[in-house]
Amino acid sequence: MAMTRSLEVKGQLVAGGKEPLICAPLVGRDEAAVLRELEVIVAKRPDLLEWRVDFYSGISDVERVVELAKEIRRSSAGIPVIFTRRSTREGGEPIGLSEDEVLSMYRAVARSGAVDFLDYELSSQPEHFEQAVALARETDTKLIASFHDFGKTPPVDEIVAKLVAMEEAGADIAKVAVMPQGLEDVLTLLQATLEAQKKIRLPVISMSMGAYGSLSRLFGWVFGSSVSFAVGQQASAPGQVPIEDLRTVLEVLQRSLKGE
């Protein structure tokens, strides 16, 4: 029985609908660093790549961003790509762009056909989020609505409410990442993920961050999280597990759940 909801790209299931999907981040500061990182990661065959463009030093030059996005596409061996600008309020790097400039960059990249998913934060102004929804529809990309709290883990009902709000706002996928202060908070995140399956139809991506939170990256999919983020070469968030280690643990858990 499937425990997660599958992600699709242009009508095709990502990685044939396997669960969970493994996503590796690209966090290089310049073109050479991103492409070196990409070469290492592609050899490890994750199911998804996420380009964290807020780490990229050339972010203010839209043409450079688009060209690098195209090069990532050419060199990604067919692995679908998530395009993400993480804001400083949700743990990202400072970039010196207005939100209108960020959306202009998103438009240029999405219209280039170089990416499959757009990650955009629910905490953005409603008019900006509406533009992201419209862009995803226009370009046949999928919109991941995201929420990150690097300070705490909200209660179950608040996390579920965020996920419901993402669906209501027009997202295709709902993502939450929160910081635990103890093991109880990891349980809170897992419970919220399970509860969300009853409330919304979207695929959910959820994770607890930090050392405690690494547990959620290993077995969060059992509770309904469709994607686990792993380290390909460099981590983009605290608590990420190396791809090889994550894959090993997943194989053991999957065999156990099948009674093997």
From Swiss-Prot:
Residues the record marks as active site: 148, 175
GO molecular function: 3-dehydroquinate dehydratase activity
Domain of life where this protein originates: Bacteria
SUPFAM superfamilies attached to this UniProt entry: Aldolase
Disulfide links within the chain: none
Record: residues binding 3-dehydroquinate: 50-52, 86, 217, 236, 240
Reaction(s) this enzyme catalyzes, per UniProt: 3-dehydroquinate = 3-dehydroshikimate + H2O
Pfam families named in the record: DHquinase_I
Cross-referenced HAMAP family: AroD
Function according to Swiss-Prot or TrEMBL: Involved in the third step of the chorismate pathway, which leads to the biosynthesis of aromatic amino acids. Catalyzes the cis-dehydration of 3-dehydroquinate (DHQ) and introduces the first double bond of the aromatic ring to yield 3-dehydroshikimate.
Alphabetized PANTHER family for the sequence: 3-DEHYDROQUINATE DEHYDRATASE
Record protein name field: 3-dehydroquinate dehydratase
Species per Swiss-Prot/TrEMBL record: Aromatoleum aromaticum (strain DSM 19018 / LMG 30748 / EbN1) (Azoarcus sp. (strain EbN1))
Gene giving rise to this polypeptide: aroD
